[in-house]
Amino acid sequence: MKPVALVSGAGAPSGIGFAIAKALKANGFDLVITSTTDRIKVRAEELGVRGEVADLTKANEVEALLRSIETLDVVVNNAGMTSQISPLAEDDSQSLSDVSIEAWRRGLERNLDTAFNLTRYSLPLIRKSDAGRIVMISSVTGPLQAMRNQPVYATAKAALIGMVRSLALDEAKYGITVNAILPGWISTDTQPEHERLQGMKTPLGRSGKP
């Protein structure tokens, strides 16, 4: 039987989540990929896997998703966003004194609550696996470096590291490993000009590739 992996935030064709899904598929995994929009159906068809539309900030939707999965070996928590690539979150990109309560809560929901919900409801399944794996996609912003006007995003991504450390200790008795990946700026199809400027800050003169 093939191992089964669940990858969140895999709807963007040039994003990290979809790249991870492609790599897992190439390595023999059965997959469930999720996004908040219908474009996940297109990505799923491209890979020949199952795609589900789900808002991972809502516990009831996550619980329903996990009830529809019989076995699960790997969870990749990739859902989330920075305000610099989302016009819907422009008011998050401010100094802390200017961030509204609504923007603060929305940023933590998208970048922290999504990982909490998906991990919490997937644990009963992963604990049954012979080699369960949980991966959090964090960021260099927050845990390793500062970025101006990103207090919400940085806080959420740093908090993921604390979640990883705690989970790793708690779930070791089930043979589950828990790790975080902290990428820098990764090239996507969201803001080419911003990616070019970010690339100027690196030795190779370009952004990372998914």
Predicted regions and their residues:
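Catalytic Tyr-X3-Lys loop
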Residues: M81, S93-F116, V135, L160
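Active-site loop of short-chain dehydrogenase/reductase
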Residues: K2-P3, T71-L72, I126-S139, K173-I176
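Conserved mid-core segment of classical short-chain dehydrogenase/reductases
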Residues: T82-R105, R148-V152, T190-P192
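Canonical Rossmann dinucleotide-binding motif of NAD(H)/NADP(H)-dependent dehydrogenases/reductases
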Residues: K2-L31
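A glycine/serine/threonine-rich, flexible loop-to-helix segment
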Residues: A89-S93, K173, A180-P210
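Amphipathic alpha-helical dimer-interface segment in Rossmann-like NAD(P)H-dependent oxidoreductases
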Residues: R106-K128, A168-L169, K173
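Catalytic loop of short-chain dehydrogenase/reductase
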Residues: G9-P13, V99-I101, R133-A159, V164-K173, ...
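Structural signature of the Rossmann-like NAD(P)-dependent dehydrogenase/reductase core
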Residues: V7-G9, N77-N78, G132-S139, T177-L182, ...
